[in-house]
C-alpha cells in the first residue's frame, strides 16, 4: 500500500503543478499578459484542462496569430467548447478585417451559431455574394441588441 502511494506521489505533484499553471494562465489572460501565457503554456500540456490554457494563450494574441496557428489549434482541440469559442473569435476578427474568403471558409464549421455579430457578417457575405435581401434579418438582429 505504501509503495502504491509513493508511486502515485509524482503524478499528484505533476497534476498540482498543472493546476497552478492553469490558475496563473487564467490570471494572465484577465490581465492581457500574452507573454506570461506563452511562457506558462508548456506547463499545462497533457493536463485535462489543457484546452483552456491553449485557448487563453491564442485568444490573447489573436490579432497577430497566423491562419496556420489557428488551424493547428482548431484541429488539435476539435470538438471541444474551446475550439468553437476560438472559431467564434476568429470569425469576428475575419469579419472586422473584411476577409470574406476566410470568413466564408470558416463559417460552416461554426457549431454554436450564438453570436449576433458573426451572424451579421454572414448576412453581409450572403448579400454581397448572392444579392439576397437580408434587410429583415439584419433589422431583427439590430433590435435584438437592445434586449441582450
Regions from the PLM with identified roles:
Residues 1-6:
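Sec-dependent N-terminal signal peptides
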Residues 8-10:
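N-terminal signal peptide c-region/cleavage motif recognized by signal peptidases
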Residues 12-148:
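Alpha-helical solenoid repeat scaffolds
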Amino acid at each position: 500500500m505504501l509503495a502504491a502511494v509513493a508511486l502515485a506521489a509524482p503524478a499528484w505533484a505533476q497534476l498540482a503543478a498543472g493546476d497552478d499553471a492553469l490558475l496563473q494562465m487564467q490570471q494572465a489572460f484577465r490581465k492581457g499578459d500574452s507573454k506570461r501565457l506563452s511562457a506558462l503554456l508548456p506547463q499545462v500540456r497533457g493536463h485535462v484542462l489543457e484546452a483552456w490554457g491553449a485557448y487563453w494563450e491564442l485568444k490573447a494574441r489573436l490579432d497577430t496569430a497566423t491562419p496556420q496557428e489557428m488551424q493547428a489549434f482548431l484541429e488539435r482541440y476539435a470538438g471541444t467548447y474551446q475550439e468553437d469559442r476560438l472559431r467564434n473569435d476568429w470569425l469576428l476578427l475575419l469579419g472586422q478585417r473584411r476577409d470574406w474568403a476566410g470568413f466564408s471558409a470558416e463559417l460552416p464549421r461554426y457549431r454554436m451559431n450564438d453570436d449576433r455579430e458573426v451572424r451579421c457578417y454572414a448576412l453581409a457575405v450572403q448579400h454581397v455574394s448572392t444579392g439576397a435581401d437580408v434587410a429583415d434579418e439584419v433589422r431583427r438582429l439590430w433590435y435584438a441588441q437592445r434586449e441582450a
